[in-house]
Curated annotation (Swiss-Prot):
Keywords: Flavoprotein, FMN, NAD, Oxidoreductase
Organism: Opitutus terrae (strain DSM 11246 / JCM 15787 / PB90-1)
Gene3D superfamilies: 3.40.50.360
Cofactor(s) recorded in Swiss-Prot or TrEMBL: FMN
Gene Ontology molecular-function annotations: electron transfer activity; FMN binding; oxidoreductase activity, acting on NAD(P)H as acceptor; oxidoreductase activity, acting on NAD(P)H, quinone or similar compound as acceptor
Encoding gene (name): azoR
Assigned protein family: Belongs to the azoreductase type 1 family.
Cofactor note: Binds 1 FMN per subunit.
HAMAP family associated with the record: Azoreductase_type1
Uppermost EC category: oxidoreductase
Protein's recorded name: FMN-dependent NADH:quinone oxidoreductase
Sequence positions that bind FMN: S10
Subunit: Homodimer.
């Protein structure tokens, strides 16, 4: 039985391109894996808490700190990490908002990049960190206005979503990160259907590779 974790972060609950693509991916995944379990987490409707001082103190607390103290503060982080760890594959809807991640997706990343759970301190100055999560494929559905911030676009260097997710996920062990990109239709209505069709074809190409992995 294969488990797919679907994370949506678009502020648009309707008319969202990334939600459309994550839904399409989940449908195609279920068609390939007939006994699949699809776990849906909407980071917009149920946003993770942001990091604060009690969280930092609990995350870096000494091992002999009472469990009840840590568990109360880190409950949301534990839930998200347990969910991520249990998944065989992950699909993320991540539109480009003001050059970077939607705030709710950034909060999610902050909750899952956690010392002792998803990475360890090695004590070795040459290699100070070690990833703790088992490898699994991650597919990111991303959308940017008119495509100018997608690879090859005039403003691609301003797109911080792809390097941010690649770095953060790779840091905790998820190094197989693939991107499916679609241009929004703010200015070029004619190009939008072609971009969306190309993104849906990309999904069809990725799935067999994941199944064979």
């Amino acid at each position: 039985m294969k488990t797919l974790l679907v994370l949506n972060s678009s502020g648009r609950v309707t008319r969202s391109l990334t939600r459309r693509l994550t839904s399409r991916f989940a449908e195609a995944w279920s068609a390939v894996h007939h006994d699949a379990v699809v776990v849906q987490r909407d980071l917009t409707l149920n946003p993770p808490p942001t990091i604060n001082e009690p969280w930092i103190v609990a995350a870096f607390a000494a091992p002999d700190t009472p469990a009840t103290v840590r568990e109360a503060v880190l409950r949301a982080s534990d839930e998200l990490l347990d969910e991520l760890t249990a998944a065989d594959a992950v699909v993320i809807g991540a539109p480009v908002y003001n050059f970077g991640l939607p705030a709710q997706l950034k909060a999610y990343v902050d909750q899952i990049v956690r010392v002792g759970r998803s990475f360890a301190l090695t004590g070795d100055a040459a290699v100070p960190y070690r990833a703790l999560l088992a490898p699994k494929p991650v597919v990111v559905m991303t959308a940017a206005s008119d495509g100018v911030m997608l690879p090859g676009g005039a403003l691609a260097h301003l797109n911080l979503v792809e390097p941010h997710l690649t770095a953060a996920l790779g840091f905790i062990g998820l190094t197989d990160v693939r991107f499916v990109r679609v241009a929004d239709s703010v200015a070029d209505q004619a190009a939008h259907p072609h971009s969306l069709a190309a993104a849906e074809r990309a999904i069809e190409m990725i799935l067999p590779r994941l199944a064979a992995a």
